[in-house]
Amino acid sequence: MTRVITVASGKGGVGKTTITANLGVALSTYGEETIVLDADVAMANLELILGMEGKSVTLHDVLSGAASIEDAIYEGPGGVKVVPAGISLEGLRKIKMDRLESALEILVDTSDILLIDAPAGLEKDALAAIAAAQEMILVTTPEVPSISDALKTKIIANKLGVDIIGVVINREQHDKTFLTITEIETILEVPVIAVIPDDPEVSRAAAFGEPLIIKNPKSPTSNAIMQLGADLIGEEYQPIEPDKKGVISKLVEGLLGRR
C-alpha cells in the first residue's frame, strides 16, 4: 500500500523543503518508487533545490484544470519522481486546491511513497496538503517560535486524523539557548526521529541546484537524512565517513601535486 506522507513545519524558513527534497532522493536510492509533490503553490522552492526549474507543465496547470497530473511528473535526481508546483503568478490565480485530492489519487497508484511538501502556515493550501496525507513528519528548528508553530500544526493534524510519525529537528547546534530533544518531545508529545545538524554544505548544494545527498554524500546532513529514510522503511544504513585528512594535509598534498 502506498504511503502518503506530508512534510510540514508551521513556521517558514526552517529547511522543510530541503529535507523533503533530499529525503525523496534518499528513499529512491533505497529502491522505493518515490514521488515528491510540491504543494506550496504560492512559494514553490522544491524545483530549485532539485535543479528542475522551468518545467512546461506544473501543479499549477493541474489545479487549474489545464493539464492532467500525469503530465506534471518528471524524473529527478537519483531517480526520484517530482511534481513541481510552478512559479507562474498567472497560473497561481487560476488554481483550485479542491482538485488536489483527485490528483493525488492518481499518484498513489504509481508510487510506493508519495511525499508532499506542505506550505508553511495554516492557510487553506497548507490544510489541504495536511488533510491529503495519511502520515505527517514535522520539521522544526530547536527554537521556541518554531516549536510553537509546529505544535499548532500538530494539533490541526490530529484533528484531521493524520498520524504523526515524528519530529525532525533541523539546524541543530550546541547552543544553550536552544531547546533540548527532551524538551521538544515533551512540548509536542511526539518522538524526535531525526536530528539534522547545522551544515554549511546545505547552502552550497542549493546554490548549485543539486540535492545535498548527491553533491556531498559524506556531509553530516546527508548522513542524517539517509538514516531518516532508512528508518522510515525499516532499512539498515551505514553512514559514509568523511575524509579523515585535515585541511593542512590536503593543502600540503595539493602543493606537492603541483610540482
Residues covered by each model-derived region:
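Solvent-exposed alpha-helical segments within well-ordered globular domains of core cellular machineries
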Residues: R3, V25, A44, H60-S64, ...
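Walker A/P-loop phosphate-binding motif and the immediately C-terminal alpha-helix
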Residues: R3-D40
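Residue-level signature of catalytic and energy-coupling elements of molecular machines
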Residues: G12, T17, D38, L46, ...
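Generic secondary-structure signature for well-ordered alpha-helical cores
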Residues: T29-E32, Y74, D109, I113, ...
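Short beta-strand "acidic-cap" motif of Rossmann-like dinucleotide-binding folds
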Residues: E33-D38, N45, L115, V139
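P-loop/Walker-type NTP enzyme "switch/lid" segment
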Residues: V36-D109, A206-F208, I214
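Conserved catalytic-core segment of NTP-binding enzymes
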Residues: S102, I106-D109, I113-F208
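NTP-binding/hydrolysis catalytic cores, primarily Walker-type P-loop NTPases
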Residues: L212-R259
